[in-house]
Structures are given as C-alpha cells and as structure tokens.
C-alpha cells in the first residue's frame, strides 16, 4: 500500500466522538452517493471497497439501523460532558444533586451483551487497540470520569486542545510512584499536618488559618515546582491568601520552624534566617501579621537554579492575582536591549491559589484571567488551584455562588478544569501532572479545584458549629488525609503501622526542638523600625544636562519613519510641528513632545519603560501617538523603538478595559524588575478609584508593611473642564491622604519642561533606596496649551522644581496665590489679561512632599505681603485644601491673612452642566484675583 493510499484509508480512524454522525452519513451515501459532500464520497467509496479499512465503522453500520449506535454515542458524550457530576471528589459532606443527566448504560436502553458486540473504536479512536469491545471501553470511561478526578473540558472551543485533553484523560495512565516516593509523599503530609497540630496545641487560640482539610496543597505545589525544574523553568511566582499560607512558607519556601514559632512568640525571627542566603525575607518598619508575609527561596533543583517567590498579600482576597501575573511577566521579559522586549514564557510561571468562596465572589479574578492571552500581559499559562473547603467564613456554597462549582466562572476563558478529591493524594498529583503537560503544550491557564473541607473555624478562635452544625458533625469524625494515606500505605505493605506513628512523632520532636531554641526573653521591644535614611528626603532632581544638538538628534529620529510608511496626513501635520522648537525661535515643546524627549533620554540611560492603559498608545486625548499606523496597510511603527544609542526597551500597550487588574499587574512587574520604569495611565483619572485596593494595600503601604519597594508611576488625567462629575477629578485628595513617611511623590504640573525633568528624576530613582511611587495629575486641555509649552532651553539643563513663579517685584507684592495644575494656568491667563503687580501666582508643582521650605523662603522675600490664598477648582472637601491647610497655616502664622477660593463643599466632584461649570469656574478666578 502506498503512503498516499494509507493516509486516505486511515482517515476514518479519527471519527472518535463524531462516529454516530459519520454512520448516518455513510448510510445516506449507500442510498444516494450524491447526498454527501464530494470529499466524503471519496472516503466512503474507499471504505465500501476495502473491508480492511475502519472495521468499527462497517461493523457497526448495520447496528445503527435501530439507533443502537446513536444511543451509545449519546452515552459516551454524556459521560464526557457530565461524568463530573457523579465523580468521587468529596471527602466529606457530598452535595445532593437535584438534576443529573443520564450517565448509566441502562439509561440508554443498552446492556453488556449489546456493547460487547460493538468495537471499542466507537468510544475513542485509540481504544480499538486497547480494549476488546465498547463495553470494556465504557467501563474504563466511567471509572475515569466518575473517579477521584472530575474533568471538565468539553466547554473548550478549540478542537485541538479538547482532543488533546480527551486523549490524555482517557488513555490508561496511573501516577507511577514507587514505594520510596510514596513514603516521601506520606512524610510531606506528616510534616504538613504535624505543623498545624503543634501550633494548635502550643498556641491555643492564635490565628493561623490552618490548611487542614486541603493538606494536599503542599505536595501539589512541590510536585509543580519539581516538574518546572525538570523543564528548566527558573522562576516560580506564587500568590495566595492567608488560608494555609504558614504551611506553604515552611514546607515550600522552607522558612525555618524557629522563625515561624518566633513570630507566634513575638520574638525576633530574623536571628534564625538561614545564613546561606537561600531564603530572602524583607520587612517594613510597621510590619504585618505573619499570615500576610511572603518570601523568596533560591534552590538548585534537577540542575535548574530556581527562584521561588511567595508574594506578600493583604487580607483582601484574590487581589494578589494580577500582582503575581505582573511579577511573572517581568521575569519573562528581556528589557536590556533596544526596541521592544522579547518575552520567553519558559523562564517563569505563575501559581495562583484561590479560595472557593472568593474565586467566584471577587471580580478581580475575571479581570486577571482576561489578561491571559493578551500580547502585553500573557504569561504563558497560569496554574490556578482552588483550595476548596466548601465554606467562606460561615457562608455555605448555596449562599456563596449561583453556579454548580466555584470554578464555573473560568469556563468563559476556555480553560480546562479538574476537580480532585483532596483525600486522594495520588489523584492530586496526577491532576498536577496533566495540568503541567497542558500548560507546556498550549501555554494556557489550567484550573484545579482541590475539593476538601475546613477542619476548624475560619480562624482558630471561631466555633463553626454555631452556624454550620451539620457539616461539622461529619468533619469532626473524618480522618485526616495524613491518616488516610498512611493507612493506605500500611495496607499496601509499604510502611508498617509502627513506622507511620514513629514518623508522625518525629515531626513533633523536630518542632519541639525548634521551639526550645527560642528565648522568651528576646521579646521585640522596638515598636518602630527605622525607615531607610533615603526616605528622609523628597525625590531628588536629576541634574543631567543635554546639548541642543543631542535633543535635536533624538527629536529627528522620533520623526523619521520607514520608507513607504503612510501616516495619516492630518496626524503628520501635528507631528511635523515637533520640529519647530529646534528650528524656530518661538517654537515650544508641548506636553506630549516633552514626554517623548524624556522617554528617549531615559532609554539612552539604560532604563526600560513600560507604559500601559486604556488607549495609551495614542493617548485618550489624541496627544501621544507613540504607535503610528500606516493608513493604507494598517501596519504599525513605534518611533521609541528606534532611539539613537538606545540601551533599553520601550514597551507600550493599550490595556483591556480594566483598572484593578492592570494596575496590579504593573505594580507586580515593577516589584520584580525594579529597574523598569512602569507607568499606568488612566483613561480619565476619575476611573482610577477602580484600583483603590491596589493603591491602599500595595502601592502606598507595601514598603512600610513588607519592605517591598515600588516605583510605579500613575498618569491620572485631572482637571475641571465642564465634562461632569465623572470626567473631572482623579480624586487628588485620596492620594494625599495616603501620602506619609515620604512613601510617594504627588504632583500637579503646569510646565512641560518640569514634566520632562520629573520623569527623568523618577527614572533615576529606580532600583535604589530612593524609589517610590509617583502620582501625576496629568493634563487634558493643557496638553495643547501654549502657556504650558516651554522653549527647548528649559530642557537642556536644570531639574525638577517643586514650585514655579513668574518674575515679580518683591516690594509690590501684597497677595500670594498658591494654586496647582490647571487652576494655576487659568489664573495666569486671567491675570495676563488684567495685569496686577500686587498679585504673585505660585504654582505648587509638587504637592507631596509639600514644599514648605521653598514657600517659606519665597514669602520671606516679600516685605509688604498681606494675604496668602489657596485657590483650587475642586470642592472644599476635595482636592488639596484639607491637606495643604495645616502646612500653609504654619507658614502664614499670624503674619498674613489666609483665605480659600474654590468650590464649596460638595458630595459630587463637579457640576453636570457645562455652562454652570463655566459660571462657577469664572467666579472662583474672579474672587481669587480680587485684591481686597
């Protein structure tokens, strides 16, 4: 037989689940060949004339006349699609199913004798070589799909992925653990449970959020890390909430027992930190509870030097998920080169551990999973493990979700879901094996639902029987997984009963020895750790100077495009104006051009830049144009990939319509790669509060709590321009409330050159003790305002200025007006129309840290000063007024009058009607400039 004939003749073997349909079509063909498509006519002709081809099809076609084969196919499809509903995945308290589809042989009017007369090939194309008949194959399928792992994959739209999973699941397979490996697995479980029991006995009532009931999580993580090491994956990023965290810290990151017990005893744990540097732990000066802390373990495993990181996490469940994704992507990106970064998904992988109540309950999970296949955010597949103890504090599943499983929300992202019985440790290992194989093959997420229970209450001081008495009657009687697996090994003759109990006691002995090393007298008596000395000062200006020719060379390069690249004529006119600052005396650099020049010089310095946000490539207000589009072909060109002498990458992406996940991602990216200048830009600053959890619990407090540094920059468009209460305010007051201990820099600028110098200063601070978040109340209409634009000589030298003033005659000034951002520009333009030398406008460019010294020095130069005014466009209870008042009050003291001009206190940020806005805005300006 020729190769060509062989390919044609063997094609029917792949009918698989479509065999019932093919039988119908084959019968139609026998009646009328023209009734089927031409390609099937050729195929069926081959079958008809060759008895050696596809015996399953020919032998069953006669049986199909009474619908037998169709019933068999429906049974097979139901087992694949709904077998999980009868799977043995609940260690205790199985739910009562109201509606379970037909899954038994007799449900389809079939019996053993009938099925034994049908080829196994009807069940799955590769079963004909394994089983004698369909009955044997279906028994195998029932055992597989109704066993300790419940598989859900038929919802996946991709045929290749679905077919791969079907074959992998249905091919006879068993985790081949030899006796030594089984002993090792038992020891892992003994350590996991023994640790919890020791803490429970010796620190009664202390919160630890025990892992008991889903103990298998630890060996699952260890298996994952081992597989990753064998594949050469060097970086593992783990995110989880507090449930089981202490156990993961001790048995996955190998945090010494002495350190953990020290934390329970409130003594200094750092004296027990391994001296070999294999474990990295950081701490802030205010600290955090022990079950929020993370760490980094470095280990040589199977020839791979692995870095295993457990991210710090607040109590806000699931919010760490995008942070872990960002950290992973940072580990995968090569940014020390010109152009765009190259991403190697094989370098790192994320593992995100969820709770069963929180996974469907918190929207951040959907936002994060949506990042999975996006160019700017993909990490090549995340492993999600649900530690499913089937309760959320006191809330049972019936009140926690509207779906059968907590994992059902993941189906929309076309990912496989495996539910596994937490008491069957070998099954949990197999679930990990399949998940890791799928990730390696398809670079997509996998969800494993580890179905167990919670041994105690939400925390160890809680009594669960108050609200959940019936489940806990059974849980209290249920044996631990350590005992279940240990007895299994005893029954298999792998260990003896004495060995089992001896090792359990050995774990307790090791814990007691660790406990004995800790001196109770070593109580920590310093409630405030010292902050880094570098945080005593504001962000320092970058004083590097540039020649005119240097900046011109950069500008020319940014305005040079590939031959034949067709830019929209309207846009080209805008871009061509960027030559004017270099070839016209009155040429000015506007905001967008200042940003481009700053970015280019930063790239030349070797600092990579990553800018993301909704519409950030063009800019919400059509000002940036960092990515150009050929109007004829649609091809793109990014000028900042082609900067002369560029030493680092420029990465820019339009983000999905998400705030919390995207900001969390960028935060995580910058924490992992502190050299990266990460910027998140809000479409409008008003929408930034969708990320408030990231701001509150990570960005502004992480260093104080965990010693975790971040230099993430936020661009938040903010200004009152008559666009209503949802397109006016970035809630400046919220950021000023979060500002303390020099934990950030908050600015509202009025000068493009100051913006240039600010960006350079922020970039220079990265990967140093000085680094901190930067919050920019970025402009909207001011993007094209000539008052904001500055001549090129303000860019060639100098540095960031915290306050700006116009020229003035000191002895004539009787009134100083302090304002910021657009309010300052509005006042300046109004004053230009009616000049008054007695009024001095001062732009407060940097709001935090507040420039007290600079303002004090300025006021001291004005001998006839009578009044100081703060003017803002926000309502009095919003904006900066309540923040600046204590500072200004001290500066003014009893020497000058102090006044406020702005909107009155309001519940909403701004007026909804544009005309009313103008009236209010003009009245503020008029009253502020009025010299009493």
From Swiss-Prot:
Its EC number is 1.2.4.2. Its cofactor is thiamine diphosphate. It comes from the Bacteria. GO terms for biological process: glycolytic process; tricarboxylic acid cycle. GO terms for cellular component: cytosol; oxoglutarate dehydrogenase complex. It catalyses: N(6)-[(R)-lipoyl]-L-lysyl-[protein] + 2-oxoglutarate + H(+) = N(6)-[(R)-S(8)-succinyldihydrolipoyl]-L-lysyl-[protein] + CO2. It holds the Pfam family Transket_pyr. InterPro entries: 2oxoglutarate_DH_E1, 2oxoglutarate_DH_E1_bac, DH_E1, KGD_C_sf, ODO-1/KGD_C, THDP-binding, Transketolase-like_Pyr-bd. It is an enzyme of class 1 (oxidoreductase). Keywords: Glycolysis, Oxidoreductase, Thiamine pyrophosphate. GO terms for molecular function: oxoglutarate dehydrogenase (succinyl-transferring) activity; thiamine pyrophosphate binding. Belongs to the alpha-ketoglutarate dehydrogenase family. Homodimer. Part of the 2-oxoglutarate dehydrogenase (OGDH) complex composed of E1 (2-oxoglutarate dehydrogenase), E2 (dihydrolipoamide succinyltransferase) and E3 (dihydrolipoamide dehydrogenase); the complex contains multiple copies of the three enzymatic components (E1, E2 and E3). E1 component of the 2-oxoglutarate dehydrogenase (OGDH) complex which catalyzes the decarboxylation of 2-oxoglutarate, the first step in the conversion of 2-oxoglutarate to succinyl-CoA and CO(2). This is 2-oxoglutarate dehydrogenase E1 component. It comes from Staphylococcus aureus (strain MRSA252). The gene is odhA.
């Amino acid at each position: 037989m020729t190769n060509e004939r062989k390919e044609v003749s063997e094609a029917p073997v792949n009918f698989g689940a479509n065999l019932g349909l093919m039988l119908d079509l084959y019968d139609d063909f026998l009646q009328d060949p023209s009734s089927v498509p031409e390609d099937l006519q050729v195929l069926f002709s081959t079958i008809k004339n060759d008895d050696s081809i596809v015996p399953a099809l020919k032998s069953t076609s006669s049986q199909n006349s009474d619908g037998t084969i169709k019933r068999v196919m429906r049974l097979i499809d139901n087992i694949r699609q709904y077998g999980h509903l009868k799977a043995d995945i609940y260690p205790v308290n199985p739910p009562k199913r109201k509606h379970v589809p037909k899954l038994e042989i007799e449900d389809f009017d079939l019996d053993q004798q009938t099925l034994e007369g049908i080829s196994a090939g009807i069940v799955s194309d590769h079963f004909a070589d394994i089983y004698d008949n369909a009955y044997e194959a279906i028994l195998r399928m029932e055992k597989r799909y109704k066993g300790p792992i419940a598989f859900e994959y038929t919802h996946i739209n991709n045929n290749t992925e679905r077919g791969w999973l079907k074959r992998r699941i249905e091919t006879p397979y068993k985790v081949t653990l030899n006796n030594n490996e089984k002993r090792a697995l038992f020891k892992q479980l003994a350590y996991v449970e023994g640790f919890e029991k020791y803490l429970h006995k010796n620190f009664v009532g202390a919160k630890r959020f025990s892992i008991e009931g889903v103990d298998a999580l630890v060996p699952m993580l260890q298996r994952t890390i081992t597989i990753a090491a064998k594949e050469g994956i060097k970086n593992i990023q783990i995110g989880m909430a507090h449930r089981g965290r202490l156990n993961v810290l001790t048995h996955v990151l190998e945090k010494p027992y002495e350190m953990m017990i020290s934390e329970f005893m409130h003594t200094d744990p750092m004296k027990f930190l391994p001296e070999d540097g294999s474990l990295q732990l950081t701490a802030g000066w205010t600290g955090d509870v022990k079950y929020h802390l993370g760490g980094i373990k470095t280990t040589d495993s199977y020839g791979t030097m692995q870095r295993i990181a457990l991210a710090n996490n607040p109590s806000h469940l699931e919010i760490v998920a995008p942070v872990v994704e960002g950290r992973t992507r940072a580990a995968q990106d090569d940014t020390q080169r010109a152009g765009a970064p190259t991403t190697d998904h094989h370098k790192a992988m994320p593992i995100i551990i969820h709770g069963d109540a929180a996974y469907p309950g918190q929207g951040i999970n959907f936002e994060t999973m949506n990042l999975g296949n996006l160019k700017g955010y993909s990490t090549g597949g995340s492993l999600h493990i649900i530690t499913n103890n089937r309760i959320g504090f006191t809330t049972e599943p019936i009140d926690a979700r509207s779906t059968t499983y907590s994992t059902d929300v993941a189906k929309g992202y076309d990912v496989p879901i495996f539910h596994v019985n937490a008491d069957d440790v070998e099954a949990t290992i197999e679930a990990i094996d399949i998940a890791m194989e799928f990730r390696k093959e398809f670079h997509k997420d996998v969800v494993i639902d580890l179905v167990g229970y919670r041994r105690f209450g939400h925390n160890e001081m809680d009594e669960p029987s108050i609200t959940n008495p019936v489940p806990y009657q059974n849980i209290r009687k249920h044996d631990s997984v350590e005992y279940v697996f240990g007895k299994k090994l005893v029954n298999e003759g792998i260990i003896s009963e004495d060995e089992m109990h001896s090792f359990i006691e050995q774990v307790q002995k090791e814990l007691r020895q660790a406990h004995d090393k800790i001196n109770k007298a070593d109580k920590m008596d310093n409630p405030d750790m010292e902050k880094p000395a570098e945080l005593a000062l504001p962000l320092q200006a970058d004083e590097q100077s540039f020649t005119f020719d240097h900046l011109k060379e950069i500008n020319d390069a940014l305005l040079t495009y590939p031959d034949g690249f067709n830019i929209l004529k309207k846009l080209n006119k805008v871009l061509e104006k960027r030559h004017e600052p270099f070839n016209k005396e009155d040429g000015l650099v506007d905001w967008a051009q200042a940003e481009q020049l700053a970015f280019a010089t930063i790239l030349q310095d070797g600092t990579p830049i990553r800018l993301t946000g909704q519409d950030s490539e063009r800019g919400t207000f059509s000002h940036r144009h960092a990515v150009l589009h050929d109007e004829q072909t649609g091809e793109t060109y990014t000028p900042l990939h082609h900067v002369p002498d560029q030493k680092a990458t420029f990465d820019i992406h339009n983000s999905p319509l998400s705030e919390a996940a995207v900001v969390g991602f960028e935060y995580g990216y910058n924490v992992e790669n502190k050299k990266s200048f990460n910027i998140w830009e809000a479409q409008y600053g008003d929408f930034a509060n969708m990320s408030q959890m990231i701001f509150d619990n990570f960005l502004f407090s992480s260093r104080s709590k965990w010693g975790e540094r971040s230099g993430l920059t936020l661009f938040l468009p903010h200004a009152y321009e008559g666009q209503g209460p949802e397109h006016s305010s970035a809630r400046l007051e919220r950021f000023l409330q979060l500002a303390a201990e020099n934990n950030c820099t908050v600015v509202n600028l009025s000068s493009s050159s100051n913006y240039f110098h600010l960006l350079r200063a922020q970039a220079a601070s990265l990967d140093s003790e000085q680094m901190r978040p930067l919050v920019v109340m970025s402009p909207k209409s001011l993007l094209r305002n000539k008052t904001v634009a500055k001549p090129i000589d303000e860019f060639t030298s100098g540095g960031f200025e915290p306050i700006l003033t116009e020229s003035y005659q000191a002895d004539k000034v009787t009134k100083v007006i302090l304002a910021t951002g657009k309010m300052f520009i509005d006042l300046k333009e109004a004053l230009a129309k009616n000049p008054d030398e007695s009024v001095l406008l001062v732009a407060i460019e940097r709001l935090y840290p507040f420039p007290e010294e600079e303002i004090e020095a300025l006021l001291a130069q004005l001998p006839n000063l009578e009044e100081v005014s703060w003017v803002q466009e926000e309502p009095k209870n919003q904006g900066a007024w309540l923040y600046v008042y204590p500072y200004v009050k001290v500066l003014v003291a009893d020497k000058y009058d102090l006044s406020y001009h702005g909107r009155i206190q309001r519940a909403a940020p701004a007026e909804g009607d544009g005309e009313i806005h103008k009236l209010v805005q003009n009245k503020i300006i008029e009253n502020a400039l009025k010299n009493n």
